[in-house]
């Protein structure tokens, strides 16, 4: 298996417009950063698998079907009969930028536990990828960190996207501490220009990524929205400009970029 992703898959209720009475209309779209990355890489030919947990409900069944239809192995996807599939309400402004409201308290993805993640799946993986959303609460935090540590010992390349969502954390200080905790295990890191100062205390890509590289991270991407991406590989750094285009919705853009890079 080329890439195994661990974490959340959820429903993005995305506003699509308003009806004739001005009532907002929403579409139920599949989402969740690790799942998005698995799909993006699979579409480019990589063999991918997703490990996570959904509810025993219509949304959970739909998400499993969507991943399978996109050639993502879902054999490691658990179903929780007692907790619902996670949902996020996503509003998009005129520039295509997003605002998230999560309905996640006691949802299925948070209930991922160590026993849900098989040793066989980790042994088979060339790359094991995770994000910070599964680090916001236990038992998913402990399960994710345990799986990543096991995968590292088994020789997998560890990739990480902090994917900061302020309203999922108790406070900013807790978020920073938890997002930093797994960095010594990471081989390849993707952060946004919003997340770089949270992890390093600076907005400067050169000095910020140099700090991160000292933790043993071999390859670092800093996504810059319309301005493209900054990268560091050891002592070598560079910038790739963004391609001008009409933006409809930036949701999943970073996941798609990282999935393409890893594939």
Which ranges hold each PLM region?
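Proline-centered loop/turn at the N-terminus of a beta-strand
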Residues: 2, 47, 157, 188, ...
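Conserved N-terminal subdomain of the carbohydrate kinase-like
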Residues: 47-130
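Short beta-strand scaffold segments in enzyme catalytic cores
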Residues: 39, 87-91, 228-231
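Conserved beta-alpha-beta core of the PfkB/ribokinase-like small-molecule kinase fold
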Residues: 133-210, 228-229
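Glycine-rich phosphate/adenosyl-contacting loop at the front of the ribokinase-like
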Residues: 1-73, 77, 246-248
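Conserved phosphate-binding/catalytic region of the ribokinase-like
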Residues: 1-4, 149-153, 201-263
């Amino acid at each position: 298996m080329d890439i195994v992703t661990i974490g959340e898959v959820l429903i993005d209720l995305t506003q699509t417009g308003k009806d004739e009475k001005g009532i907002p209309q929403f579409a139920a779209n599949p989402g969740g950063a690790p799942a998005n990355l698995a799909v993006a890489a699979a579409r480019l030919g990589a063999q991918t698998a997703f490990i996570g947990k959904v509810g025993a409900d219509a949304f959970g069944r739909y998400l499993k079907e969507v991943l399978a239809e996109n050639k993502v192995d879902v054999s490691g996807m658990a179903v929780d009969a007692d907790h619902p599939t996670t949902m996020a309400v996503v509003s998009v402004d005129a520039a295509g930028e997003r605002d998230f409201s999560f309905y996640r308290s006691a949802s299925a993805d948070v209930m991922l536990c160590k026993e849900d993640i098989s040793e066989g799946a980790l042994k088979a993986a060339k790359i094991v990828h995770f994000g910070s959303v599964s680090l916001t609460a236990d038992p998913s935090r402990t399960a994710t960190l345990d799986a990543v540590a096991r995968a590292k010992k088994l020789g997998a390349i560890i990739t990480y996207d902090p994917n900061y969502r302020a309203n999922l954390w108790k406070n900013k200080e807790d978020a920073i501490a938890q997002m930093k905790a797994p960095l010594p295990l990471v081989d390849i890191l993707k952060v946004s220009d919003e997340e770089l100062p949270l992890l390093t205390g600076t907005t400067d890509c050169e000095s910020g990524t140099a700090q991160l590289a000292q933790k043993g991270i071999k390859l670092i991407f800093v996504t810059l929205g319309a301005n493209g991406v900054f990268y560091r590989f050891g002592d070598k750094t560079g910038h790739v400009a963004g391609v001008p285009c009409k933006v409809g919705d930036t949701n999943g853009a970073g996941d798609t970029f990282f999935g393409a890079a890893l594939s």
